[in-house]
Amino acid sequence: MDYEFQRDLTGGILARFSMDHEAIGYWLNDEIQGDISLIDQILTEMDEVKGSEKQWQLIGKEYSLSIDDEEIMVRANTLHFETDDLEEGMSYYDNESIAFCGLDDFATMLQKYRLFILENRRS
Protein backbone atom coordinates (compact mmCIF):
# COMPACT_ATOMS: atom_id res chain seq x y z
CA MET A 1 0.00 0.00 0.00
CA ASP A 2 1.61 3.23 -1.17
CA TYR A 3 0.41 6.58 0.13
CA GLU A 4 1.46 10.14 0.73
CA PHE A 5 0.20 13.00 2.84
CA GLN A 6 0.44 16.60 1.72
CA ARG A 7 -0.98 20.02 2.40
CA ASP A 8 -3.38 21.41 -0.16
CA LEU A 9 -3.53 25.02 -1.35
CA THR A 10 -5.73 26.03 1.58
CA GLY A 11 -3.37 24.45 4.13
CA GLY A 12 -5.56 21.41 4.73
CA ILE A 13 -4.20 17.88 4.90
CA LEU A 14 -4.73 15.64 1.86
CA ALA A 15 -4.12 11.87 1.73
CA ARG A 16 -3.47 10.06 -1.55
CA PHE A 17 -3.34 6.26 -1.84
CA SER A 18 -2.32 3.82 -4.55
CA MET A 19 -4.78 1.83 -6.63
CA ASP A 20 -6.69 -0.79 -4.62
CA HIS A 21 -6.38 1.40 -1.51
CA GLU A 22 -7.90 4.63 -2.84
CA ALA A 23 -10.94 4.27 -0.58
CA ILE A 24 -8.69 4.62 2.48
CA GLY A 25 -7.49 8.01 1.21
CA TYR A 26 -11.04 9.16 0.52
CA TRP A 27 -12.06 7.97 3.99
CA LEU A 28 -9.22 9.94 5.63
CA ASN A 29 -10.04 13.06 3.60
CA ASP A 30 -13.83 12.89 4.00
CA GLU A 31 -14.40 11.31 7.40
CA ILE A 32 -11.30 11.80 9.56
CA GLN A 33 -10.21 15.23 8.27
CA GLY A 34 -7.21 15.41 10.60
CA ASP A 35 -9.19 14.73 13.79
CA ILE A 36 -6.46 13.57 16.21
CA SER A 37 -8.94 12.40 18.87
CA LEU A 38 -10.74 10.23 16.32
CA ILE A 39 -7.43 8.75 15.12
CA ASP A 40 -6.52 7.96 18.74
CA GLN A 41 -9.92 6.33 19.28
CA ILE A 42 -9.46 4.13 16.19
CA LEU A 43 -5.96 3.07 17.29
CA THR A 44 -7.32 2.19 20.75
CA GLU A 45 -10.18 0.17 19.26
CA MET A 46 -7.71 -1.64 16.98
CA ASP A 47 -5.66 -2.69 20.02
CA GLU A 48 -8.79 -4.06 21.70
CA VAL A 49 -9.94 -5.96 18.61
CA LYS A 50 -6.53 -7.43 17.71
CA GLY A 51 -6.25 -11.06 18.78
CA SER A 52 -9.90 -11.29 19.82
CA GLU A 53 -13.15 -12.23 18.15
CA LYS A 54 -14.45 -8.68 18.52
CA GLN A 55 -15.30 -6.40 15.62
CA TRP A 56 -15.65 -2.64 15.57
CA GLN A 57 -17.20 -0.19 13.10
CA LEU A 58 -17.08 3.53 12.56
CA ILE A 59 -19.97 4.58 10.32
CA GLY A 60 -19.30 7.83 8.49
CA LYS A 61 -21.31 10.06 6.18
CA GLU A 62 -19.68 8.77 2.99
CA TYR A 63 -17.33 5.95 4.06
CA SER A 64 -17.31 3.47 6.93
CA LEU A 65 -14.47 1.61 8.63
CA SER A 66 -14.79 -1.99 9.82
CA ILE A 67 -12.12 -3.66 11.93
CA ASP A 68 -11.77 -7.33 12.85
CA ASP A 69 -8.88 -9.29 14.32
CA GLU A 70 -7.08 -9.63 10.96
CA GLU A 71 -7.84 -6.65 8.73
CA ILE A 72 -9.69 -3.43 8.20
CA MET A 73 -12.16 -2.61 5.46
CA VAL A 74 -13.04 0.88 4.29
CA ARG A 75 -16.20 0.89 2.22
CA ALA A 76 -18.33 3.56 0.60
CA ASN A 77 -21.75 3.64 2.23
CA THR A 78 -23.33 3.73 -1.23
CA LEU A 79 -21.67 0.48 -2.36
CA HIS A 80 -24.67 -1.72 -3.05
CA PHE A 81 -24.34 -3.02 -6.58
CA GLU A 82 -25.76 -6.19 -8.05
CA THR A 83 -23.30 -7.75 -10.49
CA ASP A 84 -26.05 -10.00 -11.88
CA ASP A 85 -27.44 -6.99 -13.75
CA LEU A 86 -24.25 -6.42 -15.76
CA GLU A 87 -24.03 -7.41 -19.39
CA GLU A 88 -21.84 -10.39 -20.23
CA GLY A 89 -18.15 -9.50 -20.29
CA MET A 90 -18.66 -6.36 -18.19
CA SER A 91 -17.45 -5.85 -14.64
CA TYR A 92 -18.10 -3.23 -12.00
CA TYR A 93 -15.15 -0.99 -11.03
CA ASP A 94 -15.22 -0.49 -7.28
CA ASN A 95 -11.56 0.14 -6.40
CA GLU A 96 -12.42 3.67 -5.27
CA SER A 97 -15.27 2.40 -3.10
CA ILE A 98 -13.73 -0.42 -1.05
CA ALA A 99 -10.29 -1.27 0.31
CA PHE A 100 -8.81 -3.85 2.65
CA CYS A 101 -5.62 -3.65 4.69
CA GLY A 102 -3.88 -5.64 7.42
CA LEU A 103 -4.11 -4.28 10.96
CA ASP A 104 -0.39 -3.59 11.37
CA ASP A 105 -0.06 -1.74 8.05
CA PHE A 106 -3.19 0.29 8.80
CA ALA A 107 -1.99 1.19 12.30
CA THR A 108 1.40 2.27 10.91
CA MET A 109 -0.31 4.44 8.29
CA LEU A 110 -2.61 6.04 10.89
CA GLN A 111 0.35 6.83 13.14
CA LYS A 112 2.21 8.45 10.21
CA TYR A 113 -0.95 10.39 9.28
CA ARG A 114 -1.28 11.56 12.89
CA LEU A 115 2.36 12.68 12.99
CA PHE A 116 2.00 14.50 9.65
CA ILE A 117 -1.03 16.38 11.00
CA LEU A 118 0.79 17.41 14.17
CA GLU A 119 3.86 18.56 12.22
CA ASN A 120 1.82 20.48 9.63
CA ARG A 121 -0.90 22.19 11.63
CA ARG A 122 -1.87 25.62 10.40
CA SER A 123 -0.21 28.32 12.43
UniProtKB/Swiss-Prot annotation:
Pfam family of this protein, just one?
UPF0231
User: InterPro entries under this entry?
Assistant: UPF0231
Please indicate which superkingdom the organism of origin belongs to.
Bacteria
- HAMAP family for the chain: UPF0231
Q: What does the similarity note say?
A: Belongs to the UPF0231 family.
Name of the protein described by the UniProt record: UPF0231 protein PMI2039
